[in-house]
Amino acid sequence: MQKIKSLMTRQGLKSPQESLSDLGAIESLRVPGKEEFRELREQPSDPQAEQELINSIEQVYFSVDSFDIVKYELEKLPPVLNLQELEAYRDKLKQQQAAVSKKVADLILEKQPAYVKELERVTSLQTGLQLAAVICTNGRRHLNIAKEGFTQASLGLLANQRKRQLLIGLLKSLRTIKTLQRTDVRLSEMLEEEDYPGAIQLCLECQKAASTFKHYSCISELNSKLQDTLEQIEEQLDVALSKICKNFDINHYTKVQQAYRLLGKTQTAMDQLHMHFTQAIHNTVFQVVLGYVELCAGNTDTKFQKLQYKDLCTHVTPDSYIPCLADLCKALWEVMLSYYRTMEWHEKHDNEDTASASEGSNMIGTEETNFDRGYIKKKLEHGLTRIWQDVQLKVKTYLLGTDLSIFKYDDFIFVLDIISRLMQVGEEFCGSKSEVLQESIRKQSVNYFKNYHRTRLDELRMFLENETWELCPVKSNFSILQLHEFKFMEQSRSPSVSPSKQPVSTSSKTVTLFEQYCSGGNPFEIQANHKDEETEDVLASNGYESDEQEKSAYQEYDSDSDVPEELKRDYVDEQTGDGPVKSVSRETLKSRKKSDYSLNKVNAPILTNTTLNVIRLVGKYMQMMNILKPIAFDVIHFMSQLFDYYLYAIYTFFGRNDSLESTGLGLSSSRLRTTLNRIQESLIDLEVSADPTATLTAAEERKEKVPSPHLSHLVVLTSGDTLYGLAERVVATESLVFLAEQFEFLQPHLDAVMPAVKKPFLQQFYSQTVSTASELRKPIYWIVAGKALDYEQMLLLMANVKWDVKEIMSQHNIYVDALLKEFEQFNRRLNEVSKRVRIPLPVSNILWEHCIRLANRTIVEGYANVKKCSNEGRALMQLDFQQFLMKLEKLTDIRPIPDKEFVETYIKAYYLTENDMERWIKEHREYSTKQLTNLVNVCLGSHINKKARQKLLAAIDDIDRPKR
């Protein structure tokens, strides 16, 4: 394009812009005419040759418009000019020029219509511009006319109006500043009214207004004053926040939170709140303990105020220890309740804020609120554990500040109950197991309980040695749950029962302490005399609660209210001053013996005063175990020792007889023998009487053992009229069985608190010890059965009978009648004893079974003493035994008769042949060697020869050899 322009320039042509600027030159612009174009086009041409000419033109000719062609060509001339060469070169240039001109002419001719059209458009544009110039000229003329129309007065009026508006705005600003100057009075009033949100709102509005007028010099001082006021409000707000820690008030806390929200410091407020709670715990416990210490000191010495809390706790006296502990827990409860209600407040308002935020559209503000809410929630949840840890440490310090071993049992239980309640609070507060509290009191409890248990074992031994085994007259519907010591079991079944006697909730939902006492009250408001609010009603008014006629006849014995309280306490612990248990005095029992017991009460418990003491002790042990579950195993172990010692005492007093084991009747099972041996090895100190000068080391080794008890000399077991102390034996044995039944009843409760790793001990105790209590009946009542009948006299009568008769007798022998008379006398004596003591059916059956078994074995022994016997004599034996059975079945209801087959089989063995008898001897090893030998000797001569006799005796000797 530049080349074309250059060419046009050289030929005198102008661009369209130049044509517009000088319209006059348009006419003078020479454009090749059609004729010229036609001539150029009509000239014969070779396009290829023309193109080659154009291509042969040097590139420099097409470089820039400022290129000087003449100069370029002149500079190319050689130093020596040659005319022919110059002409040839000139002709070449002309040919090139002609080719270019023709090419340009072709291009111009081709673009001429567009060129003409563009010139027409330019002409039209020029006309429009001329019209616009006329319009502008008219506008300027009218503007000058309007300007000249306004006067100086009008402009002055407008200036005054503007000044008036400015002055009105200034007056308004001055009034606002005046109001701001007086807001400090209103702020003070609002702070006194504890209207913190209103005060902060007002202060912030004042600061905002002051920032609007910051261009006034007086505002800077006002800003400083408002900032000081705001800081003062924050200080008072912090004080108000601290009041929440001890006495939470919803309205008060709502105002405080609204105020902090206005300040945008909700997170800071939560941090401050936790600091205040920590400080409140410290100040509260210190003030409570300090108050009791100063009260007990009896002076106004201020030295205690300078002590550390740990040292201050060591100055609490034993008398004030429990009240101080209760008040300490009350105060700490108030702090934790305030924290609990604080969390409730935030949960409630979080839900409300979430609901309102879901309706709004400010996403940025909602995100900030959610962040603050999440921070506060995490802070509160973390604070639960932190606050409870502080509470535990404070109470632990208090617990360890005093030696609890000097406390009475009830006082110690009271302390444990308070701590247990506190641990329950901790579990509900933050789910903590209160390891700090548990560990701090566990060791003290174990040590205390070991000493207490040792004292109780010695006391139990004294009771057993002074026990006359008389009935303790309790009601027929007696239950251990009626005793004070087991009241806690009824309370524990209802989760809402508390020591402060709150009504039991009928709802099945468990109510927490915080829910129960949220509106008022305190779980540590325990009355010391709470246990005396109810009285026991377990003693029968007359024996076993006989009929109305008996009650009226012996009404003077219906109550023991006239018996001094001192007589009811057979033993007082010299160390603790604690009466062991509530028991009925022996004098009262003697007075009640005058009345007959109602023996029809098949369910009336048989127990003694000592049994009741043991049951009460078990109740106390379970109380401690229920309160302090970590020592459950130790307590249950000590409880098992109480039962072990009672069982061992009953066996020692009434069942120990070495001759029993020689009977071969298996009266004592292997389990019972194992249990007795275990008790003797682990619990009984057999050396205490044999070696009174034992060394200190030996004494320490036997510290956990108890001397074997001795039966009271008042208990007579040698009189035949009383069936050798049958009444005492029944009371003792059945009281043990009753005690075992109570342990069976308590097994689920013990199993529930026993640690899983220790449960095998409990299972073994029940399976090998408690369940063996009823097995003591056999050896104990066997001794009575062995003396109740005169078995030796029967053997003498049987020895006088002639058994080698030659004819069958129709009349039984006299020894049968004598034996039946012995049974009749035994039955009469048994009835006499049953008037004093109810004899349970199992006991009666065992007695009859033992007596019948002994009688039958005595009969076999009598038959084994016979030197000569005929077949008729054997028939007489059968007649005697059948007569005995017939009469005996009228005296007893026991079926089948014990050892009936034992006698019949022995009598029938007389008729066996040699081979049958040999087999019979090997199969019936229940007979003694003497009895088998006599059977063989008596048969000699009748149907057994001497050779067979020797063979049978050898078989008997083979059987007897392993027994030696």
Swiss-Prot record:
There is a cross-link at K963 (Glycyl lysine isopeptide (Lys-Gly) (interchain with G-Cter in SUMO1)). Residues 82-105, 216-244 form a coiled coil. Residues 1-25, 542-564 are annotated as: Disordered. The modification Phosphoserine is found at S15, S494, S498, S559, S561. One of its GO terms (cellular component) is recycling endosome. Component of the endosome-associated retrograde protein (EARP) complex, composed of VPS51, VPS52, VPS53 and VPS50/Syndetin. The EARP complex interacts with EIPR1. Interacts with VPS51 and VPS53 in an EIPR1-independent manner. Belongs to the syndetin family. This is Syndetin. It comes from Homo sapiens.
